[in-house]
UniProtKB/Swiss-Prot annotation:
Protein name: F-box protein At1g52495
Taxonomic superkingdom: Eukaryota
NCBIfam families reported for this sequence: F_box_assoc_1 (TIGR01640)
Residues of the F-box domain: 49-95
SUPFAM superfamilies cross-referenced by the UniProt entry: F-box domain, Galactose oxidase, central domain
InterPro entries hit by this protein: F-box-assoc_dom_typ3 (IPR013187), F-box-assoc_interact_dom (IPR017451), F-box-like_dom_sf (IPR036047), F-box_dom (IPR001810), Gal_Oxase/kelch_b-propeller (IPR011043)
Amino acid sequence: MFSVNKRTQAFSVFLFFFSVPKVIRYLNKQRSLKEEEKRLEEFQLLLSKLKDVHLPLDLIVEILKKLPTKSLMRFRCVSKPWSFIISKRRDFVESIMARSLRQPPHKLPVFIFHQCDPGTFFTVSSTFSQSTKPKVSIMPGRNHYNAFRYQYVRGFICCSSSVYDLVTIYNPTTRQCLPLPKIESMVLSPKRHKHCYFGYDHVMNEYKVLAMVNDSQELTQTFHVFTLGRDCPQWRKIRGNIDYELISVSRAGVCIDGTIYYVAVRRKDNENYGELFMMSFDVKSERFYHVRTPETLWSPKCTERGLFNHQGKLGCISSNENNISMWIMENAEKQEWSNITFGLLEYPGGDFRTFSGITPAGEIFSMCYPFYNMPLCVHYYNVKQKSYRRVEIESTRLKTRKQPRDIIRVFAIHDFVENTMWL
């Protein structure tokens, strides 16, 4: 038996070795904070010395273009001219986005985690190795997780809900969330819901959100547009140049070269729906158009369909029990399509019939939404090489619920670009 002193000494040694890693991490963190504070002090000292020195505006812009995005976010507070250059000047924002596109693409996406609350987003950048399992902290989700839809356009993410009257724009670069105002005189109900689509007009440099409100009881449909960055931020009601029977479905749309593409269905009455159509919305002119598609694309045997941007071309993927078909619109003016059909072998853990997206390299990927104690997995299928790969990301959640509603919402972006524009 150990004496009291020996047991106390052994316990002290145990605590020492147990706490050493924590102490080291704490000291490293404090050291990095001190280094950051020192750099900021040096920069402020440099600014004070340069108060009376006049630098040409073009030279300032060129210097700022060389800085990393994280530094640019800090330097917004230097002065109003700097803030305007970094966040509002179009040529500067475009140059940062172009620089981001020139960087070698990552095999793994940037993950956007959403708590099913429009004001609660957080981002995990995937610069890690595929062989590792990086840990991320995931907050428990709320009910109606599948009522949210996400659309990514030029560094921005639009999160909307067909159940709730709310729309949020999120910029992962600036970590800024912008909840849009509610549409006037609109009360959502089981018989009245809305679908939103996000687009960009490169001619006028405007980001717009299109909302289509459908009332299945009154058999009416109204159209509303919100333009980001205007002095009077509010929804505008527009006149839709399409039949009121054509209503949008709950699937996410895609914006390519100033045109939003989405899927619509022809309504026969309050309960029954007919054939499917591909529709487009020109972001600049705010007009709707029909898109000519192959008849087999809307086969009743297809259970899942999804739209995507494939190297600047509109793509549509559909699946049935045996096959998956990829359709690519090779010519937007003539609306000519090409097709690749392939069968999928059974792959443990990955259901590629549940389409999540496609990488710039042409890999189809499917994501599983984990429960509180399961890792997040991304499954990839290379169409050309007919090969699979699986990426697992460990997640830590608050283990307070064990219901299916605890599934988190994860949005993966493979062609992410940094956008310094302030919302």
